[in-house]
């Protein structure tokens, strides 16, 4: 998977800011990625969120739900381990 620079900007209808961390892998037909978003402007200003994204093999974000196959879990877990703030927010989700 091509490395994407972080931090980098994102913009959504309800706010914009920076992608602070990203954990992604090459998944064959797509490249799943989890992104830590930090809102700097808009109605979500000051909040953080996790975006579950799917990229095409060409590196473009796809407009569809992210599906992660269980065979991808170990590789994605290793990438999440390199993103401590994202990992902490995910931990809050599941614990």
Where are these regions (language model features)?
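Intrinsically disordered, low-complexity sequence elements enriched in Ser/Thr/Gly/Pro
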Residues: 2-6, 49, 75
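Mixed-charge, Lys/Arg-enriched low-complexity segments
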Residues: 56-95
């Amino acid at each position: 998977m091509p490395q994407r620079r972080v931090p980098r900007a994102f913009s959504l209808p309800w706010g914009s800011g920076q992608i602070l961390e990203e954990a992604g892998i090459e998944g064959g037909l797509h490249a799943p990625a989890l992104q830590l978003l930090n809102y700097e402007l808009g109605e979500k200003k000051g909040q953080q969120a996790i975006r579950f994204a799917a990229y095409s093999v060409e590196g473009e974000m796809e407009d569809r739900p992210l599906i992660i196959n269980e065979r991808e879990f170990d590789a994605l877990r290793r990438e999440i381990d390199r993103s401590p703030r994202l990992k902490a927010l995910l931990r809050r989700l599941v614990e």
